[in-house]
Amino acid sequence: MTKPIVFSGAQPSGELTIGNYMGALRQWVNMQDDYHCIYCIVDQHAITVRQDAQKLRKATLDTLALYLACGIDPEKSTIFVQSHVPEHAQLGWALNCYTYFGELSRMTQFKDKSARYAENINAGLFDYPVLMAADILLYQTNLVPVGEDQKQHLELSRDIAQRFNALYGEIFKVPEPFIPKSGARVMSLLEPTKKMSKSDDNRNNVIGLLEDPKSVVKKIKRAVTDSDEPPVVRYDVQNKAGVSNLLDILSAVTGQSIPELEKQFEGKMYGHLKGEVADAVSGMLTELQERYHRFRNDEAFLQQVMKDGAEKASAHASRTLKAVYEAIGFVAKP
């Protein structure tokens, strides 16, 4: 039986965090045996905000090495860089003509980003969700692992696919969201009611996957908990957001359930919890970084992974693009 196709991607425009790892990358790794996984480094999305060219090139290779270090296996999955597969931009343009201005105007991420990058509100930033739809629909994707912040974009992808299919027949699979049961959201260390973000200006809120583990220990020990007396280590997102966040992180790293951890820390101080979280996270990062540096220092291997991945992706993408071009009436290239 053919495995369902999963597509997902991440920008190379900033260092990945443990939030990215626990909320996305680890799920990607776990899906490799049961699904046909296609994972993309979306460098074309990254340039919707200004990038330094040298830094972008470095960040792309860094991100690829991190994917591999986290356990994404090029023998099991297709891993590639978006700009290496021109069908993404080609389908993106075609889908622009089947997407309405009003739909894009309602995208909350555009509103947020245009406020943050007021000096550079470019058409690419506005049009970002259409390229994302092309990314997904090119591969006849069945499932897309999405966080809450991308659900609206996936809904638009589904709408575009259904609109196109209604006009031309079943050209696209209509993708479904895949939302993991747990580990999907790691919150900010000092503001635990908001999601941890690699673009956060306050670096004390964020744990980067490539950060010095000693620095991470200090950050975790400064993390917000609670002011109750005596302290109670209990999972309660509404009333104990900081404590709950630390329990979520510890559970994700160790594999222990939340009830097991609550029992383990019964009668203990918040300092005990922070110490355990710090030890677990720093240990995990030390091992991950050793693997990362091994891959990052072998640039010939990274180049081969990108080349092989782009060839596999393009073989799949070109079939979809050919069907789209034929449906809309383009003359086939001689």
From Swiss-Prot:
Key words of the record: Aminoacyl-tRNA synthetase, ATP-binding, Cytoplasm, Ligase, Nucleotide-binding, Protein biosynthesis
Alphabetized CDD domains for the sequence: TrpRS_core (cd00806)
Listed name of the protein: Tryptophan--tRNA ligase
Signal peptide stretch: none
Chief location: cytoplasm
One annotated Gene Ontology cellular component of this protein: cytosol
Catalytic activity as recorded in UniProt: tRNA(Trp) + L-tryptophan + ATP = L-tryptophyl-tRNA(Trp) + AMP + diphosphate + H(+)
GO biological process: tryptophanyl-tRNA aminoacylation
The organism of origin for this protein: Escherichia coli (strain K12)
Enzyme Commission designation: 6.1.1.2
Alphabetical list of Pfam families matching this protein: tRNA-synt_1b
Superkingdom of origin organism: Bacteria
Quaternary assembly: Homodimer.
Motif 'HIGH' region, chain ranges: 12-20
Location within or outside the cell: Cytoplasm
Enzyme class of the recorded protein, top EC level: ligase
Protein encoded by which gene: trpS
InterPro entries: aa-tRNA-synth_I_CS, aa-tRNA-synth_Ic, Rossmann-like_a/b/a_fold, Trp-tRNA-ligase, Trp-tRNA-ligase_bac-type, Trp-tRNA_synthetase
Known outcome of mutating residue 196 to I: In TRPS271C; activity largely reduced
Gene Ontology MF: a single term: ATP binding
